[in-house]
Amino acid sequence: MAESAQKKDLTVVIPAYDERESLAELLRRLDAVIQPLGLSYEIIVIDDGSNDGSSELLRELRGTHPALRYVEFQRNFGKSAALAVGFARARGDVVITMDADLQDDPAEIPSLMAKLDEGFDLVSGWKKERKDPFIKNSTSKLFNLVTSMSAGLRLHDFNCGLKAYRREVTESLRVYGEMHRYLPLLAHVMGFRVTEIPVRHQPRQFGETKFGRSRFLNGMLDLFTVLFLTRQRSSPLHFFGRVGLAFGTLGSGICLYFFWVWIDAGALRLRPLLLLGIALILVALQFISLGLLAELFVASRDNQSHIQIRSEG
């Protein structure tokens, strides 16, 4: 059987951007943890457009690490793109994701897999004692609090890179933009069983963190996208219709007021407030029309494509 067709028990997917200094040690630790488990496994490193010679090192490391596979991007496409490519190439029944900076401990892999064996489909790590700078810790806590309260999925650490997935989960998820932050939420909405366990978090040994304020802001914007897609996917008219009705009600109220003024006074001049009422009614009609068009688009697609079937007889 060709290598590309061989199934594995376990795939480890590692997005890497300018993490050359940590790659050799990370692979050594992974082999040391996984080999005693007696599992067939592969390690897929996605070089996300690194400028530090990571790909050259990965070519060398393939000679001493038979389980290693790597993909080199032409440029930096982001963590979501790296995970999507890794998921598409994974052959394992279980897929582990982790960061390449040695802050995620490979020794946690058996615990993650044991939790999957309890019947869960996705197990997310919870960095209970983070070894990150104060600003990164604070923004991460705020992000996780807002996400947990908005989404209805109670997790402490949505963005932990260390996660375990059943293969059917990675095959079902669409990862793009900054959606890697919300994979537990997306899986939960699709009906998969999601949980978390505390994991050790190590101080960064090499390089610099890729965290920035823009990533936090982008993540919050993507949260609105996720909430809209998960809650209004099957009936977008409910969302656009409510917005349209709100504008329409306000605009109609203004126009009715001026109608009674006209009845009472017998004359009515064109006033800015009346123009606002007319404009609000037109905006309401546009929102409702947009909702109807979105409904037609949803109806034209296979509406069962997002339904996950656990079993059938």
Predicted segment positions?
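A conserved acidic beta->alpha catalytic loop
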Residues: D47-E56, L102-Q103
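Hydrophobic helical membrane-anchoring modules
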Residues: A2-Q6, E178, Y182-G313
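Cell-envelope/extracellular polymer assembly enzymes that use nucleotide-activated donors
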Residues: D9-T11, E42
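Acceptor/aglycone-binding surface of glycosyltransferases and processive sugar-polymer synthases
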Residues: E60, V71-R75, K79-R89, V94-T97, ...
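Short beta-strand/loop segment that forms part of the nucleotide-sugar
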Residues: L39-S50, V71-E72
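Acidic helix N-cap motif at the loop->helix transition within catalytic regions
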Residues: E21-E25, D52-L61
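Short, well-formed alpha-helical segments that are part of the catalytic scaffolds
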Residues: E19-I34
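Donor nucleotide-sugar binding loop of glycosyltransferases
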Residues: E19-S22, S50, K79, D105
